[in-house]
């Protein structure tokens, strides 16, 4: 199916389409390297998240005025919104070193004890994916956060002895994409909790102009707006698309990104005007063309697009639901009227009638 600038621009995908997604918000190796160069150094330079920035600024300024370590901070939100960047800014604002680790890397209480015992006074410990930490380590963290002390168990069985280990005051910055998985005793020990929201297009345009300047890439307002509109409200995706459009501009044009260059480049990379890629369109295309818009079960839909059900449910569906293109109902997955319009298709009469109860006439 061919499509214009507002809809699909390539043929329908066939077979698995998960590899190398430009619109995946999780960081890859290239992202990690480039983000270090693009990362803001302080709160004033950080774009977006106005409420979190304002509140965090007060917390950090108050801590500096008291000459104390900052309260423990919990940052929640989808991948790619700036949680790691904010943790580094917290350390910079407090003029403190930062130690970075992740929940999956701490599978035993001893792993955590080794990290905590090596911290310097005032150091910031950034714990990414804190919800994936093991339960024994989690329970040790309670005491460390509240009393700056841990009990290290020496020996086994009846002869085991708990030896208290005093810790220097430190600031824990926890990051999670699933705050609901954190037990209340852990959540309650954070002095400040900030939820990271998806970015508005205007905020992403500011991110893109700043990144383009640092990458020495020319970009005009319309070019930035075109990329921002396809970036799913996520700075990491915006910066990734910017790099790919930059490549196209260097090879196919004179290096400056305007609207036409951005559209042509993103057509090559199969990211459409709403930020859908091949996997998203495969799911919607199967739902509309093979199943008349649904309802259809998740497993059946996954087979139709040649992907695992977990891939469809965890990778494609969240964005489609957020965009109002797909609904999860007790009877199965159902396409919305917006999905039909986006792919330029007309819903069958029985599909439209069957969906009235969900979406109106």
Swiss-Prot record:
Residues 1-21 are annotated as: Disordered. DNA binds at residues 309, 328, 333. Keywords: ATP-binding, Cytoplasm, DNA damage, DNA recombination, DNA repair, DNA-binding, Hydrolase, Nucleotide-binding. It is an enzyme of class 3 (hydrolase). The keyword DNA repair applies. Residues 200-270 are annotated as: Small ATPAse domain (RuvB-S). ATP binds at residues 38-39, 80, 83-85, 146-148, 189, 199, 236. One of its GO terms (cellular component) is cytoplasm. It holds the Pfam family AAA_lid_4. Residues 273-361 are annotated as: Head domain (RuvB-H). It is found in: Cytoplasm. Residues 1-12 have a biased composition (Acidic residues). Residues 13-199 are annotated as: Large ATPase domain (RuvB-L). One of its GO terms (molecular function) is ATP hydrolysis activity. It comes from the Bacteria. Mg(2+) binds at residue 84. Its EC number is 3.6.4.-. CDD domains: AAA. It catalyses: ATP + H2O = ADP + phosphate + H(+). HAMAP family: DNA_HJ_migration_RuvB (MF_00016). PANTHER family: HOLLIDAY JUNCTION BRANCH MIGRATION COMPLEX SUBUNIT RUVB, PTHR42848. Homohexamer. Forms an RuvA(8)-RuvB(12)-Holliday junction (HJ) complex. HJ DNA is sandwiched between 2 RuvA tetramers; dsDNA enters through RuvA and exits via RuvB. An RuvB hexamer assembles on each DNA strand where it exits the tetramer. Each RuvB hexamer is contacted by two RuvA subunits (via domain III) on 2 adjacent RuvB subunits; this complex drives branch migration. In the full resolvosome a probable DNA-RuvA(4)-RuvB(12)-RuvC(2) complex forms which resolves the HJ. The RuvA-RuvB-RuvC complex processes Holliday junction (HJ) DNA during genetic recombination and DNA repair, while the RuvA-RuvB complex plays an important role in the rescue of blocked DNA replication forks via replication fork reversal (RFR). RuvA specifically binds to HJ cruciform DNA, conferring on it an open structure. The RuvB hexamer acts as an ATP-dependent pump, pulling dsDNA into and through the RuvAB complex. RuvB forms 2 homohexamers on either side of HJ DNA bound by 1 or 2 RuvA tetramers; 4 subunits per hexamer contact DNA at a time. This is Holliday junction branch migration complex subunit RuvB. It comes from Streptomyces griseus subsp. griseus (strain JCM 4626 / CBS 651.72 / NBRC 13350 / KCC S-0626 / ISP 5235).
